[in-house]
């Protein structure tokens, strides 16, 4: 094709591609990318050409770019080899703040070879989907998993050393000896070994001080804390190189998989890989709904907590001023939580096909992702309240605790019926996972919220992660088990991203809170979420 001919479309919407670094001042490297849209255009000579809207894997959507076909390569083994060669060359010549990391660069030590998310150098630290900017004075370090050297190994083939020989069709026990225990609220508390609790601020401070002082035992603690659900298993290294020391410093994010969630994932592994079951698709509670409900739950908890704390102030003026500041803080946190869950959704969409499916389920799961099924699931999610709230909890509870009671007030206590249903759903969650076990206090606090905060909660309850115009996403098909697998992968993504350490400090508590929320919903992982593929395989979903 010459410059005087019409251009041929080379890439399609949704296709995974490799894209060259768009900034010519940076080293010439290739990033994992995805074609979001294809635009047919005409030049001055009325000749056709195509622009491709590209999203860079692991980057914020604000960095999406329109590029020509010359900047793109097909995602195949030959071009992957070129990607590794360019990355190796970039590592040799990088200077200053250039932060491109290639997972398969031969010069990296074997224990760090398979980087699953590649972050390019950007001047703006908000380039990562999970980059947030809420100021915080507390740092939380969590434990994460290691890696394998074998690129042909199943990314999710976990060690079976602690699994029962024949899995039982029910969830394992919630706690094991030596694991971190929980109080009635679902928060981690100290176990027999003296591990710090989730809410122990002094423990976080001590760990922060250790990190600043360069604790000599830090590496050993990281290795001992690694989860068996790591996507990879690191071989034991006989010596430590300078390059390996440098990469250890890049391990900024460590995510501890709690004992309860670990057992859910063991159960999921046994059901799929041992008993040859498949996940019922679409999930009863899809990932999009889980993420949305988490934001709504946290909004209610924060709002009620502010009211209870602020009411202790004696001076009315000072109390009102403090409440106003606290309400502003809650609104800011909730807005950031929306960004966090959207980042989790983006990571899931990118990593599902390559890293979040067991071999035993891959054909079935990908076979379900037909255009018709995706479209129908999207329609169901947009129009069906039962799909969003599959438990069907729609009974109203008055402040006196009577079902369908109004406590002498005509109509719902706090607003329209949808607002009331969502609020009471959140309050029941608090009751179930709280040590106080007194729903009247929570309802009293919710009832006394000022109109401004009620209006904000109403807006939050009506918020959706995906708009009705959004194209169908895989996150409306899959449920909690696949989301939990993504959380195991998440440290690799964040460690390879350009997000700053300060932003990570703010982000980690929100991720920790989300893990706590996920593991408190046992019903998302039970046997009702599985089916026999011989009976249901190849089915089409109808609206």
Swiss-Prot record:
SUPFAM superfamilies per the UniProt record, alphabetical: Chromo domain-like
Subcellular location, record wording: Nucleus; Chromosome
Residue ranges of every copy of the Chromo domain listed in the record: 10-90
GO-annotated biological processes: cell differentiation; regulation of DNA-templated transcription; sex-chromosome dosage compensation
Family matches, as InterPro entries: Chromo-like_dom_sf (IPR016197), MRG (IPR008676), MRG_C_sf (IPR038217), MRG_dom (IPR026541), MSL3_chromo-like (IPR053820)
Region (Disordered): 93-247
Posttranslational modification: Ubiquitinated by msl-2.
Keyword entries, A-Z: Chromatin regulator, Chromosome, Developmental protein, Differentiation, Nucleus, Transcription, Transcription regulation, Ubl conjugation
Compositional bias of kind Basic and acidic residues: 180-202, 210-224, 234-247
A Pfam family this chain is assigned to: MSL3_chromo-like
Major localization class: nucleus
Domains (record comment): The chromo domain specifically recognizes and binds histone H3 trimethylated at 'Lys-36' (H3K36me3). The chromo domain also mediates association with roX1 and roX2 non-coding RNAs, promoting recruitment to the male X chromosome.
Name of the protein: Protein male-specific lethal-3
Annotated organism of origin: Drosophila virilis (Fruit fly)
This protein's encoding gene: msl-3
């Amino acid at each position: 094709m010459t410059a005087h001919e019409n251009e041929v479309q080379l890439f399609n919407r949704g296709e995974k591609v490799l894209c060259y670094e768009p900034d010519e001042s940076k080293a010439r490297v290739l990033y994992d990318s995805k074609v979001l849209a294809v635009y047919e255009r005409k030049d001055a000579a009325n000749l056709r050409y195509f622009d491709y809207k590209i999203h860079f894997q692991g980057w914020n959507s604000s960095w999406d770019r329109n590029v020509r076909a010359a900047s793109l390569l097909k995602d195949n083994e030959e071009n992957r080899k070129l990607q590794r060669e360019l990355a190796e060359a970039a590592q040799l010549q990088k200077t200053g703040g250039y932060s491109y990391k290639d997972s398969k660069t031969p010069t990296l030590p074997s224990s760090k070879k398979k980087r699953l998310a590649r972050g390019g150098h950007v001047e703006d630290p908000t380039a990562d989907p999970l980059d947030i900017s809420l100021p915080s004075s507390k740092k939380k370090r969590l434990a994460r998993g290691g890696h394998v050297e074998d690129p042909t190994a199943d990314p999710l083939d976990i060690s079976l050393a602690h699994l029962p020989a024949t899995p039982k069709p029910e969830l394992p026990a919630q706690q094991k000896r030596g694991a971190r225990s929980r109080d009635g609220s679902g928060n981690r508390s100290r176990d027999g070994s003296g591990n710090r609790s989730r809410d122990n601020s002094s423990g976080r401070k001590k760990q922060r001080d250790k990190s600043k002082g360069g604790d000599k035992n830090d590496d050993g603690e990281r290795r001992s804390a690694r989860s068996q659900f790591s996507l990879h298993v690191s071989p034991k290294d006989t010596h430590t190189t300078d390059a390996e020391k440098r990469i250890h410093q890049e391990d900024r994010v460590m995510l501890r998989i709690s004992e309860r969630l670990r057992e859910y994932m063991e159960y999921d592994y046994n059901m799929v890989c041992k008993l040859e079951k498949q996940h019922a698709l679409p999930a009863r509670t899809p990932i999009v709904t889980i993420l949305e409900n988490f934001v709504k739950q946290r909004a209610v908890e924060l709002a009620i907590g502010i009211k209870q704390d602020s009411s202790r102030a004696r001076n009315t003026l000072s109390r009102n001023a403090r409440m106003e500041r606290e309400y502003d803080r809650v609104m800011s946190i909730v807005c950031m939580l929306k960004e966090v869950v959207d980042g989790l959704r983006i990571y899931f969409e990118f990593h599902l096909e390559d890293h979040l499916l067991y071999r035993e389920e891959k054909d079935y799961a990908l076979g379900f992702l037909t255009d018709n099924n995706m479209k129908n699931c999207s329609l169901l999610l947009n129009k069906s309240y039962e799909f969003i709230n599959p438990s069907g909890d729609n009974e109203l509870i008055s402040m006196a605790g009577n079902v369908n009671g109004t406590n002498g007030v005509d109509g719902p206590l706090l607003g329209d019926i949808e607002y009331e249903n969502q609020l009471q759903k959140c309050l029941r969650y608090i009751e179930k996972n709280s040590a106080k076990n007194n729903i009247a206090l929570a309802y009293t606090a919710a009832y006394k919220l000022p109109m401004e905060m009620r209006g904000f909660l109403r807006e939050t309850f009506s918020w959706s992660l995906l708009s009705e115009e959004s194209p169908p996403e895989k996150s409306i098909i899959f449920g909690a088990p696949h989301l939990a697998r993504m959380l195991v992968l998440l440290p690799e993504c964040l460690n390879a991203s350009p997000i700053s350490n300060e932003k990570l400090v703010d982000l980690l508590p929100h991720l920790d809170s989300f893990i706590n929320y996920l593991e408190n919903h046992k019903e998302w992982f039970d046997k009702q979420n599985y089916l026999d593929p011989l009976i249901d395989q190849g089915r089409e979903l109808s609206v």
